[in-house]
Amino acid sequence: MKMSREQYAELFGPTTGDKVRLGDTDLWIEVEKDFTNYGEEMIFGGGKTIRDGMGQNGRITGKDGALDLVITNAVILDYTGIVKADIGVKDGRIVGVGKSGNPDIMDGVDPYMIIGAGTEVISGEGKIVTAGGVDTHIHFICPQQMEVALSSGVTTLLGGGTGPATGSKATTCTSGAWYMSRMLEAAEEFPINVGFLGKGNASDKAPLIEQVEAGAIGLKLHEDWGSTPSAIKACMEAADEADIQVAIHTDTINEAGFLENTLDAIGDRVIHTYHIEGAGGGHAPDIMKLASYANILPSSTTPTIPYTVNTMDEHLDMMMVCHHLDSKVPEDVAFSHSRIRAATIAAEDILHDIGAISMTSSDSQAMGRVGEVIIRTWQVADKMKKQRGALSGENGNDNVRAKRYIAKYTINPAVTHGLSHEVGSVEKGKLADLVLWDPVFFGVKPELVLKGGMIARAQMGDPNASIPTPEPVFMRQMYASYGKANRNTSITFMSQAGIANGVPEKLGLEKMISPVRNIRKLSKLDMKLNDAMPNIQVDPKTYQVFADGEELACQPVSYVPLGQRYFLF
């Protein structure tokens, strides 16, 4: 039997060589491989193939290995590739990406992907599946952020804070062992993975180690607490001892030292640099040069990406609010103006496109928007395609660019903070934190968000309707968000020292606990598809940015995709 590509795509979703548009962007991904055996596709429904004795094995039990969940015929967009496959989930983890079904009557079925009577089905035909996002720059200012992040497709939040305290509104620190304990307790209620950063600003290691032993997954150095060379050195030494990450927001006004002094204090040790673009803070005007170094893992945040005609005006007022500044004080106004530089903000987009900035993150409620990491990442990708054209290695599709950009908010932040053994990609063995998208809504509004293999958020219609689809349809909480289900579908990340110190037992934590690990030997070469290290220079007078001698300049845009048309109602 033969059918046209169009007919096949309508029935079973795209196959090898077919292209899918991402939302209303100009980005098109092409399926590189299809794991399906043509004619043996797994489809659920009346008269379809997942029935007893057909695609569903009638003998296998859950104990024998039958899947708990199969997502059928999905296009998977991951840093590892763009493929069409079934995804098998067992005990909340991905056990296979390939061909599911009944090996009694089918060839090529993955032995770990057998469908049985105990298997639930999510139809992925015509859908895109991505890994849940990992946001590494969270100010934990209000718990409602969790709902917004999860609804956007982000399933892991890392950062610091204790609520709308003045310190937390400005810095991503959960300061001290007592607050660390209380935030770990609060995290029990959230159907999302979390990890908390302690305050790293101390010239002695003792108060830093105390926070790590209380469960902090890392330490945050912030200029508002004094990112001095002595504090940096002590923090780096504590991190080396505990195998944790350090995130740094450097000294904007160069009060305790210049960029070179910070580099000397860091040495050759790995560190995650927030706000590599400088608008969110950091050595003015040349913080961007840090993206040249092998031990620097750079990220930037949603406020400045992509560069638009409104970016500059928006930032000055945001700066005043977020960093407890006063518009009546000339020095505070000068402080704000020193950060907001059009030339460096423009260069940020290009550095993302060449893979020199490795990660994107939100800076939630502290200049950034927690629900827009994914949207803005893809807006940058679209802007760069329109302004810079295809990337090397692309032939009629945008696969190289798509894989580079999705890595920025999935695998790379997971690697940076020692979580990649659990989350960050659609790979065997990882927690089934998966996001299903209708291609027309890609990047904006997920259809389903799975946590640990269970649906936590979904586009759902009127609960009193006779079917699930009548209006109003919007993102609603699902069963993984209720009761004790979230304890078995979400992870609280913790330092190895905190786990060894018995923190989960002392606090009576019921959520899954996982240690961060394998951090201190990382380098930028570990940043998937985003490991470029050009020689970056910034003109101190004009703020022009150069990479390997080439000026990085682009124009602001007045229109972005994935924007207003999706939020009319």
From Swiss-Prot:
Residues noted as binding Ni(2+) 2 in the record, renumbered to the chain: 220, 249, 275
Record-level GO cellular component terms: cytoplasm
SUPFAM superfamilies named in the record: Composite domain of metallo-dependent hydrolases (SSF51338), Metallo-dependent hydrolases (SSF51556)
Active-site residues, record numbering mapped to chain: 323 (proton donor)
Subcellular location: Cytoplasm
Reactions mediated catalytically: urea + 2 H2O + H(+) = hydrogencarbonate + 2 NH4(+)
Binding site for substrate: 222
Pathway this chain belongs to: Nitrogen metabolism; urea degradation; CO(2) and NH(3) from urea (urease route): step 1/1
CDD domains in the cross-refs: Urease_alpha
Cofactor binding note: Binds 2 nickel ions per subunit.
The protein's Enzyme Commission number: 3.5.1.5
GO biological process: urea catabolic process
The entry's keywords: Cytoplasm, Hydrolase, Metal-binding, Nickel
Cofactors that this protein relies on: Ni cation
Residues that coordinate or bind Ni(2+) 1: 137, 139, 220, 363
Processing and modification events after translation: Carboxylation allows a single lysine to coordinate two nickel ions.
One Pfam entry name: Urease_alpha
Subunit structure: Heterotrimer of UreA (gamma), UreB (beta) and UreC (alpha) subunits. Three heterotrimers associate to form the active enzyme.
Protein name as annotated: Urease subunit alpha
Source organism phylogeny: Bacteria, Bacillati, Bacillota, Bacilli, Bacillales
Name of encoding gene: ureC
